[in-house]
Amino acid sequence: MFAQLDTKTVYSFMDSLIDLNHYFERAKQFGYHTIGIMDKDNLYGAYHFIKGCQKNGLQPVLGLEVEILYQERQVLLNLIAQNTQGYHQLLKISTAKMSGKLHMDYLCQHLEGIAVIIPSKGWSDTLVVPFDYYIGVDQYTDLSHMDSKRQLIPLRTVRYFAQDDMETLHMLHAIRDNLSLAETPVVESDQELTDCQQLTTFYQTHCPQALQNLEDLVSGIYYDFDTNLKLPHFNRDKSAKQELQELTEAGLKEKGLWKEPYQSRLLHELVIISDMGFDDYFLIVWDLLRFGRSKGYYMGMGRGSAAGSLVAYALNITGIDPVQHDLLFERFLNKERYSMPDIDIDLPDIYRSEFLRYVRNRYGSDHSAQIVTFSTFGPKQAIRDVFKRFGVPEYELTNLTKKIGFKDSLATVYEKSISFRQVINSRTEFQKAFAIAKRIEGNPRQTSIHAAGIVMSDDTLTNHIPLKSGDDMMITQYDAHAIEANGLLKMDFLGLRNLTFVQKMQEKVAKDYGCQIDIAAIDLEDPQTLALFAKGDTKGIFQFEQNGAINLLKRIKPQRFEEIVATTSLNRPGASDYTTNFIKRREGQEKIDLIDPVIAPILEPTYGIMLYQEQVMQIAQIYAGFTLGKADLLRRAMSKKNLQEMQKMEEDFIASAKHLGRAEETARGLFKRMEKFAGYGFNRSHAFAYSALAFQLAYFKAHYPAVFYDIMMNYSSSDYITDALESDFQVAQVTINSIPYTDKIEASKIYMGLKNIKGLPRDFAYWIIEQRPFNSVEDFLTRTPEKYQKKVFLEPLIKIGLFDCFEPNRKKILDNLDGLLVFVNELGSLFSDSSFSWVDAKDYSATEKYSLEQEIVGVGMSKHPLIDIAEKSTQTFTPISQLVKESEAVVLIQIDSIRIIRTKTSGQQMAFLSVNDTKKKLDVTLFPQEYAIYKDQLIEGEFYYLKGRIKERDHRLQMVCQQVQMAISQKYWLLVENHQFDSQISEILGAFPGTTPVVIHYQKNKETIALTKIQVHVTENLKEKLRPFVLKTVFR
């Protein structure tokens, strides 16, 4: 029977449409018993292909296509693994090929268990190679020209499932080669998957011996994987068990904990670790963290269930004492449930490459590697790549891909988006392109590297998996799942920017305050830090900076560290339903049901609410006498909702509880309660470890806020300016001679850096810093290299006031910029003693300056206009920070945004405003009656007094507005010659509606008219529009 050997899969990137799952399905439909894959150079899909075939009742045949230079000739070879030995040889051959190191001598040394096929298209009778081989023939091979001494074998290339796929493969080739469809060679025909019996009949008729050779070749093919654990030996000269015991005992003694119950807990854990064969694992993790600390890196408090291990704590793998905090080892490692321990190594994200180098050097470049991942065609990428080759312009592509949501597939967006569907259906070629895009969506496009994963092995990795070359170290060809399935150790090196933040804050405190802080040793009950959590002042704090967590903190108002840990756990679906109960019970406003005195100590810390998975385990241990290992199995069954297992466990739980003298009814009720909570109970060990890291960051924010904001603003892409301003920091005005490159905070002043100016070349910014001081605008421009003498680079510097120290009129500098550039480049060199003749100009208003600064660097740097208004105000108002719920108040604010809706009942319009007073933000509601009165006055960016009642909603204050009053009584004055352009002026003014009154003075007849029906929003654009029709404009 025919066997399909030469199948290219989607792992021959953009050269095939054969994905494995559909391959298995179609092969069975077409009557195949034996199928193969033969990707070019790589074995990316080999493991999943073999396991998939076995699962689907198909015989797998693993092949590899390589091209090798021999005697100045490129020879194309198809290599077939005939057995497990041949499989292992293919791993090595593919690794050599993917590392650029494959040559004929190496190949010949690794051909045991491998059959070689040379396709007839690449064969000639002059070819002489140092090994036996088959000649692969297809339906189009001229058999009369074949060497009669060579064995023939059927070999038909497959790249797609059906002839209809040829157009899609043609598109993939165009994308791969970055060509248009017209420039891309057409795809070879007759490479679709064909019925097995049809091909069997063909070869029986035309080349029966070739078919027999194929049957003989594949008849005994079978592959077996070694799935045994292959942990690297940490120290070949010493017992891992002995070394681990010595290190952990020394660690506890160093911490002053060599006493009971620590000694018995340590012995208990060491026995389990040794029995499960994981001594080397702990030593390797210890070694990696030791390396980080030896370099001065902050390695954090650990994460996950590993925080429940005393061994990990003694080795400083984690920073939480599991005995003191009642954390369970069995939640981490359970002898009754064999699985690899999983300790993720957190490290500062800026040092990850250092760890990769250490692993490579310490454990060997052939024993360690990074892990491959596959980038696929996402819906947006598929649309962009395909439609581009149909000649669709970029702006249309952008508009189309904007309609695709983050979680959308092409099928779902077509179904739910009317506008997307209309575009696709508007043209025949769009429908065709869309069909192709859907066909390639999800297919691998290229390889990438796992963000965290590293694989390590006791022996050479290529004995187990194929590799390829990488920049820092080798990269696996198998994905993470296939690696672990082969018994290899996968470790995750997780670069956490929060650890970078902590380390940089420690360094800055030491530099600025001369104070060395051991952040791992701070008091987790520090009052100032607890107060910060209680206020919800946690912007920038790991795990607690999202609005949901902030609002929860404001409700709970944690009074001790344990309640911060509880907040982490309550901030999850399901558990959050018990927040009110938690608060009321803590305040004594609701009865705490502890069920049975024997489990009261387990439930008391969380006021009778089962928040943690460990509580379920402890209850099973104390109430029903389960071992903690068995209790962990119960927890897993509950969390996975394994009904059959849970039913069995329930009967066991009740029987065991009754054996201890518990009442059956109580036991059954308790089990149901445990079952309910286990579905969303949180890992207490993980919650503790990450809450500790959050507390460390918050400690800096509470005690060293200037350090906190300085680091967060310079090492994070998030915007912390608003938060800093709400914490009484002020943005300082900087000059060309003082502005830093990165943001800087000194005392309570924020100095915005040049890096914030969008579009400013970094080299130009560095040049400014290196060349200063400058003593005038002319001096700066004279010394500026010609490549930077462009208005697009210079104007932002002027608009944000960097030259105010030389000339405070920014508009004047801008209006003279063209002349200045001519002067410094031409006239200045001719007449060195001459000076530039400045032309005067009316400067920007304070509001305009502030707006320009906001636009360019994201925040105003000069004095906020609202502060000027406040200083001159005769009206009483309350800062937003001092508002009290259920009180009447007047606030002086600027409107940031206006959102208008219609009420569901009456259909009337009402509005939601977001406003600020330069320090804090406030949400304001105008109901229909008030909105109808004031809607014409409300303009984003303008300043107002708002009067209303302060309410609390979702634990945030907001105002229900009753009155609106403009804060500025300025008018917009127009000086015009006569009435000639009245209609044009009226039309322009009408296009800029606002709240500023307009007064027109006619010069010819000395007439002054205040417009009663038109008020405007004064902008530079308005001035420009009016310029041809007026003599002068004044805003005053």
From Swiss-Prot:
Primary localisation category: cytoplasm
Catalytic function, reaction form: DNA(n) + a 2'-deoxyribonucleoside 5'-triphosphate = DNA(n+1) + diphosphate
Catalytic class of the enzyme: transferase
This protein's UniProt keywords: Cytoplasm, DNA replication, DNA-directed DNA polymerase, Nucleotidyltransferase, Transferase
InterPro entries according to UniProt: DNA_pol3_alpha_NTPase_dom, DNA_pol3_alpha_thumb_dom, DNA_pol3_finger, DnaE2/DnaE/PolC, DNAPol_HHH, NA-bd_OB-fold, NA-bd_OB_tRNA, PHP_dom
EC number in record: 2.7.7.7
GO BP: any one term: DNA replication
CDD domains, alphabetized: DnaE_OBF, PHP_PolIIIA
Gene Ontology CC terms, in alphabetical order: cytoplasm
Domain of life: Bacteria
GO molecular function annotation: 3'-5' exonuclease activity; DNA-directed DNA polymerase activity; nucleic acid binding
Subcellular location: Cytoplasm
Complex and partners: DNA polymerase III contains a core (composed of alpha, epsilon and theta chains) that associates with a tau subunit. This core dimerizes to form the PolIII' complex. PolIII' associates with the gamma complex (composed of gamma, delta, delta', psi and chi chains) and with the beta chain to form the complete DNA polymerase III complex.
NCBIfam families noted in UniProt: polc, PRK07279.1
Known role: DNA polymerase III is a complex, multichain enzyme responsible for most of the replicative synthesis in bacteria. This DNA polymerase also exhibits 3' to 5' exonuclease activity. The alpha chain is the DNA polymerase.
PANTHER family, sorted: DNA POLYMERASE III SUBUNIT ALPHA
Family: Belongs to the DNA polymerase type-C family. DnaE subfamily.
Name of the protein this chain belongs to: DNA polymerase III subunit alpha
Native source species: Streptococcus pyogenes serotype M3 (strain ATCC BAA-595 / MGAS315)
